[in-house]
Amino acid sequence: MKTATYFEQPSPQLTTLYHPDGKTPYPYWNILLRPAGSINASARDMAAYVQFYLNRGAVGGVQVAPAASIDRMETPTRTWEAQEGLKAGYGLSNYTSIHEGFVYHGHNGGVDGGITDMSYLPEYGVGYFYSVNSANGGAFGKIGDAIRAYITRSLTKPPVPAAGELPANAADYAGFYVPAAPRNELTHFLSSGLGLTRVRFDGGKLLLTSLGQFDQPFIPVSGAQFRYVPKKGPAEPIATAMLLRPNAEGRFTYLGGAMVRIPTGLAILQIALTAWFVLAFVAIVVYAPFWTIGGLIKRRRRPAERAMRLWPLIAVLSLVAFVALFVVSGNDAIQRLGNLTVYSIGLFATTVLFALASVASAIALLMARREEIRRFVWWFSILVTASLLIGTAYLAYWGVIGIRTWS
């Protein structure tokens, strides 16, 4: 590989990276953390890199690296599931992925405005590399689908293992799970809630239900390993899920990531509180226009109720602003949130305002004279204020209140 280097290169040798619009350029980003990659290389050199894997470490007939080293790179060993026998997963900068019934090895990557994928089928002797210089994930996915369809057009899919028996202790694993170690700590507060997953067993299958998925089937292969059977498309030919042995940290499953079981009561409470918060959020927004318009009519003004209705609305609007800032920062999140900008300061300010407004809602409720408040408004205020305080406590627990992304 004649051009590959960790170091920043003169601009004439670098391609320009663009936003999803294909017109607005990104500044070049030379990542300093080598475990993350940051290798600059030409497409020709990357093609040679794919060939290096396919030839099991040989280049031009010369064995540069032992074939055993390539095998080791492709083999996960350190994760719990790997130590219990699961072959699919992350090795040494090389992981397995399954597309249309074929098992690929390789790695992808991305920076602002640049996405790439290097994958190969060692058993068939074919592979590919491609990259795009635009943050257009949709186009990137379509290109990858087209390439994989082309290189596998005359290949026979690997056989699918016969269905095995459920482990004798499978019922012990039924229940609710949450991600044990999310990749992104910044959004841990979301994955802890939105990642709630239910595992159950029926008809000799493991059935997985999570947000956006219902009873996704996994077929037992051998031992505690399972292979996924998509409702559309070919079945996966290798096991990619596993029931892990319980340890001092709890009972875990591997379902594309380590999942830890939580008590059913806690899961139900989590679902109920989330539903309560969402309903309160919607109710505050829906109710606001009515009391706002009513406040313009003198005979309908109710000063005693004003603070009880205003503070929850401020809390909700601050949360909306928080989400909007995240969305608007999207394509430039590192630049906008990683520095002291109006976006990062906005996240800090809106979360603090949400907490203060939620507390102010409770104070307004406590200080209100019961006899001056309509019964409906009183109970409405209690329900929405309680939900806002619960939301504040949850976000504070995960460090979201007063978040400083620039530090």
What are these regions (language model features)?
Residues 55, 136, 183:
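Flexible, active-site-proximal loop/turn residues at the rims of small-molecule/cofactor binding pockets
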Residues 50-53, 77, 98, 129, ...:
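Generic short alpha-helical hydrophobic face used as a protein-protein interaction/packing hotspot
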Residues 40, 134, 164:
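Charge-dense, low-complexity intrinsically disordered segments
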Residues 106, 117-120, 124-134, 251-255, ...:
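Short, well-ordered beta-strand elements
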Residues 112, 135-137:
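A short acidic/small-residue loop/turn micro-motif
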